[in-house]
Structure formats: structure tokens, C-alpha cells
Design a protein with these regions (language model features):
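A C-terminal junction/extension of Radical SAM enzymes
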Residues: 212-232
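Conserved AdoMet/S-adenosylmethionine-binding subsite of the radical SAM
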Residues: 55-67, 76-216
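Short, charged low-complexity linear segments at domain edges
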Residues: 1-18
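A secondary-structure boundary/capping signal
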Residues: 23, 35, 71-73, 161
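Conserved alpha-helical substructure of the radical SAM core
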Residues: 37-68
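Short gly/ser/thr-rich secondary-structure transition/capping motifs
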Residues: 3-6, 52, 98-100
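Conserved beta-strand termini and adjacent loop/short-helix elements that scaffold enzyme active sites
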Residues: 6, 190-192, 229-232
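Canonical Radical SAM [4Fe-4S] cluster-binding loop centered on the CxxxCxxC motif
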Residues: 14-49
Length: 232
């Protein structure tokens, strides 16, 4: 695994768990609001973490940690992801995956083999706005739709989440996304933070006020029973 970053202990990234967070490099999207530009655009310039150091840490922390979060970048691009997760599971640790959902084949394999306990999938926009919000004019949004369907049909815990960027996503867009993921376990609206964005122009954009986000929650709740706001 090409590991590029590491938060050794987190109480907030994996609901209900004390976890370590591992960051992979590389991504197939170019989302303008992304805060991990180095991992997305220049992963080769970020030094690899020694994998043996991670395994030694997990062994030492046995009984204290109970989860591992694999995030990015986009973890499903890593060819060693599945065997890596198998090794984590062999340590009796729970696994949370953060993903953009563009590799439904990898997600299906992880779900089918019971290798993940929680998936947080970013749903960037309504289907018609996906090319704009991901920076990919030729994006195949059906692949994202397949991942949405896989999670809705699974028996693990999961959430869909959207970073709400003013000028790019409005109330009607959030309602359309909620309709797209209708019946999901959980949908989270994430507050946009105008810092270190992949597109520096967005650093001049003020986030939505909290009351605006909660109005979006109200509208999304028509389609998803549990809707939350994060980051306000």
C-alpha cells in the first residue's frame, strides 16, 4: 500500500470507535473543493510511510484501538487495498473506508468478502452536475450510481456525504441528491471550508451560514430519515 499520511489516534473519524487514520495517495477526481491537493495532484512528491511502522503500531495498540480508517486521496485506486484490509481484519480491527464511489467493482469485492464495517461515500452533486464538481467532463456517473445501490443494498453501516459549496450547490441540488440516495441510512451535509482548496479561487468563497444548511437538512429529510450537518 502506498500510504502518504497518518493520524495515529482519532475519536471523530470512525463513529463509535477509537481509530487510526491512514491516507493513500492519488485520486481519479479533481474536485475543486478538495483539501488534499498534494495527495491528489502530486502523490509522488509525498513520501511513502513505511508499512511495517503501521503494523508495529497496530500491534502495540491492540486493545486500545478498535478501528482503522482508510481514506485519501482515493483508496480504491490502490491495487493492494483488499489484501491490506485483510491483514487489518486479521488483527480483529474494524475497518472504515472513505471513497468517492467511482470503483464499484472494488467496493463490491470489499462488501462481498465482509472486509469493511463502515463506508463513508462522497456524493459530490446531482448526477447532471457530476462532471463539473469532479473536474471530469467525461465522467461516467452510472459508476457512482452503482456504488450508491451497493451500499443501500448492504447490511453494513454507511453514510453518504456532500460538501456544500456556495455557488456550486444550492438547496435544490441537495434535495435532488437526497432523492437519488433515497432510503439511505444516513446523509451528511458537510460545511465547506475555504482553506487549501484544490481550486484556489474557492478560498475566496464564504461558506453557507448554519441556518441555510439546516434548511437544506429539512428538505433532504423528505428522502432520507437521518440527515445531519457536520463542521458547523
Amino acid at each position: 500500500m502506498r500510504l502518504k499520511g497518518w493520524v495515529r489516534t482519532s475519536l471523530i473519524d470512525f463513529p463509535g470507535h477509537i481509530a487510526t487514520v491512514l491516507f493513500t495517495g492519488g485520486c481519479d477526481f479533481r474536485c475543486p473543493m478538495c483539501h488534499n491537493a498534494d495527495l491528489v495532484l502530486r502523490p509522488q512528491d509525498v513520501p511513502d510511510l513505511p508499512e511495517e511502522e503501521v503494523w508495529a503500531f497496530l500491534s502495540r495498540r491492540a486493545g486500545l484501538l478498535d478501528g482503522v480508517v482508510i481514506t485519501g486521496g482515493e483508496p480504491t485506486l490502490q491495487p493492494d487495498l483488499i489484501p491490506f484490509v485483510r491483514q487489518i481484519r486479521a488483527l480483529s480491527l474494524n475497518v472504515k473506508l472513505d471513497t468517492n464511489g467511482y470503483r464499484p467493482d472494488v467496493l463490491a469485492a470489499l462488501l462481498g468478502d465482509g472486509l469493511v464495517d463502515y463506508v463513508a461515500m462522497d456524493v459530490k452533486a446531482p448526477p447532471d452536475k457530476y462532471p463539473c464538481l469532479t473536474g471530469l467532463p467525461d465522467l461516467d456517473v452510472a459508476r457512482v450510481g452503482r456504488s450508491v445501490a451497493l451500499l443501500r443494498g448492504s447490511d453494513i453501516s454507511y453514510e453518504f456525504r456532500t460538501t456544500v459549496v456556495p455557488g456550486w450547490l444550492a438547496e435544490t441540488d441537495i434535495e435532488e441528491i437526497a432523492r437519488w440516495v433515497s432510503g439511505a441510512q444516513r446523509y451528511v451535509l458537510q460545511q465547506f471550508r475555504p482553506f487549501h482548496t484544490l481550486d484556489p479561487v474557492l478560498e475566496q468563497v464564504a461558506p453557507y451560514p448554519a441556518d441555510k444548511l439546516y434548511e437544506m437538512v429539512r428538505r433532504a429529510a423528505r428522502w432520507v430519515a437521518q440527515v445531519a450537518v457536520r463542521g458547523v
